[in-house]
């Protein structure tokens, strides 16, 4: 028997939840991956993908087929699915889905700013932007010279506007300041998304809060790793960490003081969930920290589908689909470059 909250969930969101679960069921299987890694050419890869749920998604492409074309078309397909969810959603699911797009918008803004810094054409950079993070004012990003310019002229009408409150400055947007801006925006965004999920309560909070806590901790580890050997001070590094997660607050304080990977690993050793991840880095498989984080992310997102009546399945599906796209692109790159020794280094999902 459904309780009140679950009954209302089904009335407003049951159709879309059923749909996204159906989409998840169409993710590539382990057998699909076994078949893909045996392909000799990108045309072979295309033919096999046609036998899966991807169907004729490359039908309109003329030869030669490239990895970039495959990547672009898979992203477009994911974006089409997501837009369908969004166009048929009711509040508060609509707001949840908007939060999901913000991370892609941040990445696109940073990509465009770096492109402008390197004097690349806007058209070239727009082609590399993620379709889930597109917004009307994107093409004007390259005119901004400071974060204040960026906010006042371009982003004030976008969902990113609230995250700029802690980022306003008149500093010139050089490479370092652009990277700092990315991390500050992500910090504000993750904190806001976490607060939204926590305040929503119910199963959505139970599923999404641990996922976002992991994302916050992952960002803290990666920020720390990337700051070694740079001019970023320990004090400034600490201001970039999201203020929630398993590491908050003591682990973040210790991370801020870390001076190399071993010291960072020592911090992770205090946390049962992160110790085995760091122990898996390197070894016979040659895994990077990024690899083990992706593997953990996949596990958490697969588990999200074990619960019902929550928004987390939409987040989890998009993340799993993105990992599938990364897997296919990795296999396609290995085939294209005839570098087959690492072709099995993808991250299985199902």
UniProtKB/Swiss-Prot annotation:
Pfam family, one: vATP-synt_AC39
Keywords: Hydrogen ion transport, Ion transport, Transport
A GO CC term assigned to this protein in UniProt: apical plasma membrane
Tissues in which the UniProt entry reports expression: Kidney, osteoclast and lung.
GO molecular function: proton-transporting ATPase activity, rotational mechanism
Gene Ontology biological process terms in this record: regulation of macroautophagy; vacuolar acidification; vacuolar transport
Coiled-coil annotated spans: none
Function: Subunit of the V0 complex of vacuolar(H+)-ATPase (V-ATPase), a multisubunit enzyme composed of a peripheral complex (V1) that hydrolyzes ATP and a membrane integral complex (V0) that translocates protons. V-ATPase is responsible for acidifying and maintaining the pH of intracellular compartments and in some cell types, is targeted to the plasma membrane, where it is responsible for acidifying the extracellular environment. May play a role in coupling of proton transport and ATP hydrolysis. Regulator of osteoclast fusion and bone formation.
Protein name: V-type proton ATPase subunit d 2
The organism of origin for this protein: Homo sapiens (Human)
